[in-house]
Amino acid sequence: MLKIAVLLSVLACALAGTIPDGLLPQLDGRIVGGYETSIDAHPYQVSLQRFGSHFCGGSIYSHDIVITAAHCLQSVDAKDLKIRVGSTYWRSGGSVHSVRSFRNHEGYNARTMVNDIAIVRIESDLSFRSSIRAVRIADHNPREGATAVVSGWGTTESGGSTIPDHLLAVDLEIVDVSRCRSGEFGYGKKIKDTMLCAYAPNKDACQGDSGGPLVSGDRLVGVVSWGYGCGDVRYPGVYADVAHFHEWIERTAREV
């Protein structure tokens, strides 16, 4: 396990002013209550890295495009970014690629976390194989209760200071936006129409999983965005709603 307490502290301090109404964005991703998996089961999964350390996840959209969260790329230069693909382990294996450019959604708001999505263009084209594949993006939301899987190298407990070397995944259920903002859970009006929720008791994404994929029916339906703690029964994980951004993703992938 890699000790990253200092890194997490720096990130928390740097972004303290952007936390919406006391809620903690899932910076750097985490999987709580999950299981070890392999990149062959999630070949679209990538690790975003700076200075040799994993800090966010992402999803392969095409041979040279990755989808991630806008909050992952605040105050970041493209020249400092690397993306590891095709490996179950964020520290080794697969291949590492430089980043040519990226674009955050122009409507991203760090206080409310709306439009928390970004497009990254890799410097060189990826060679697809069993461990490196693009994922199709959703053009409509999955039904309430549909099974979904989120994967990543995030911490395994809320506030954790270590991240696993091995890729983890957890199975969740989709929660309709109207239900997610209802009194059943604790978010209320903080849940916006650009967001999607997913939930299972004591299971969740966590710090370090940010930007990573939520997949249902072999489609990318969500991008790990934020939440209150990790695995809290009152607070589902909150994701950028990929179907809502379908046209933006297609357009920006051509332009970035």
UniProtKB/Swiss-Prot annotation:
Family of the protein in this entry: Belongs to the peptidase S1 family.
Record-marked site positions (Required for specificity): 204
Cystine connections: 56-72, 180-197, 206-230
Any single biological process term in GO: proteolysis
Reaction equations catalysed: Preferential cleavage: Arg-|-Xaa, Lys-|-Xaa
Enzyme Commission number(s) from the entry: 3.4.21.4
Coarse class of the protein's main subcellular location: secreted
Record's keyword annotation contains Disulfide bond: yes
Record-linked Pfam families: Trypsin (PF00089)
UniProt gene name: epsilonTry
Domain Peptidase S1: 31-254
Name of the protein in question: Trypsin epsilon
Superkingdom of source: Eukaryota
Signal peptide start-end: 1-22
Cellular localization per UniProt: Secreted, Extracellular space
CDD domains in alphabetical order: Tryp_SPc
Cross-referenced InterPro entries: Peptidase_S1, Peptidase_S1_PA, Peptidase_S1_PA_chymotrypsin, Peptidase_S1A, Trypsin_dom, TRYPSIN_HIS, TRYPSIN_SER
